[in-house]
Amino acid sequence: MSSIQQKTDVILIGAGVMSATLGALLKELAPELEIKVFEKLAKAGEESSNEWNNAGTGHAALCELNYTSEKADGSIDISKAIKINEHFQLSRQFWAYLVKNNLIQNPQDFIMPIPHMSMVQGEKNVSFLKKRFEALANNPLFQGMEYSDDPEKLKEWIPLIMEGRATNEPIAATKIDSGTDVNFGALTRMLFDYLKTKDVAINYKHAVEDIKRTSDGMWKLKVYNMGTGNIEEHIAKFVFIGGGGGSLHLLQKTGIPESKHIGGFPVSGLFMVCKNQEVVEQHHAKVYGKAKVGAPPMSVPHLDTRYIDNKKSLLFGPFAGFSPKFLKTGSNLDLITSVKPNNVITMLAAGVKEMALTKYLIEQVMLSHEKRMEELREFIPNAKSEDWGIVVAGQRVQVIKDTPAGKGTLQFGTEVVSAADGSVAALLGASPGASTAVQVMLEVLEKCFPQRMAEWEPKIKEMIPSYGVSLMQNQELLHEIQRSTDEALGLSEKELAYS
């Protein structure tokens, strides 16, 4: 049975952090817009945004070594780190605005202060880390970073990691106290609670099955109502496809030229979680290592203090897995049905070029619990097998596209694909993902509502004072933003409470 629904201004597909952020921005900028949300699951933030399905790192390039590469001349390129840090500052400002205006409450339920650290072993890696520290230390965005290769100092910083460790190999770490742990699931749920108060119609258990352009340039969505069994038709002027791994299939259904020659490759993630609370309490940091030679960027190992359900947890990973599903709740046919005549060459080219990734995934899938424990013991030498279990994290669909570098190039970032007229946009990709949600959704606004940006700019700057400004070039504004966001999000006093 099918029913025709009324037209609406905006439809958001997927109730994850991206749709939540875009909805919140739009309701603050243009409260008159009528917005509908369709989510096939029963609650918000249950796929990639869920707290158990991602690392929960507030990605600001404070500790992630893959954001600072070593150039041929041995110098360190920090341009990507600067960009990611500035993007995270935008998120902090928007969250602080929402808290200060009482639009969301209890920020401690979604963001906690935690030192961010990088740790490496071996002479070559120690040399790299020292050069990285020297390249970042005087940059105002990375103020307060410390470096040490003294084992006694490292025992103060990371006692659990140093206990039982042989000291015959060089080891070094950097530490910066302004890092954060972010519960993106809790944040997503808060944002949707706020959107409900703004008369946004949030429809759970509604699966979008098709999306087609109408003769008058609008978009008609075929939506399956899982509660009634009915097929509904909804029409909107603007559609945002924020369905995580499910976005690629829906983007392909739009038929827009920009959707061609794009593929996706799913990578699943596993984390080890500590079951011994005594061990959990011995560690207080997010410690990122260096990916092994030949391993993809998403394989960077890290040992993380997390705050989930107001409880301190300890996770290690990620370990990669393979499933043809594009979502944890997806279908085993997702990968094969994403291959179309316009992207088959792109996908095949990637298959040939990415043999190292294929080999890595096969090796990861074959790992036993004890083999994973061996990798964990590179971080915690005294780790006991019985103290650690496995949690299956979310699916990440890495974008494959044709670039100037050649056909079938695997992308490791987050990417907005939009129609030339701005009437539809989709978010594809993975890391740094949710941390940059505000920057990415501002990009959606710029691409899809260019005629309204001049009108909206004063309000955007009220919410996000550094919008359009380089904080690295404006230290006074940077320090004011850091102070005000720390205060609004309660980060300063919480750090004192947990240190």
Swiss-Prot record:
Keywords attached to this entry: FAD, Flavoprotein, Oxidoreductase, Tricarboxylic acid cycle
Pfam family of the protein (one): Mqo
Positions of disulphide bridges: none
GO BP annotations listed: tricarboxylic acid cycle
UniProt key word Oxidoreductase: yes
Superkingdom: Bacteria
InterPro entries per record: FAD/NAD-bd_sf, MQO
Record pathway: Carbohydrate metabolism; tricarboxylic acid cycle; oxaloacetate from (S)-malate (quinone route): step 1/1
Reaction catalysis annotation: (S)-malate + a quinone = a quinol + oxaloacetate
Enzyme Commission number: 1.1.5.4
Cofactor(s), by name: FAD
GO MF: 2-hydroxyglutarate dehydrogenase activity; L-malate dehydrogenase (quinone) activity
Family classification: Belongs to the MQO family.
Protein name: Probable malate:quinone oxidoreductase
Organism whose genome encodes this protein: Brevibacillus brevis (strain 47 / JCM 6285 / NBRC 100599)
Gene: mqo
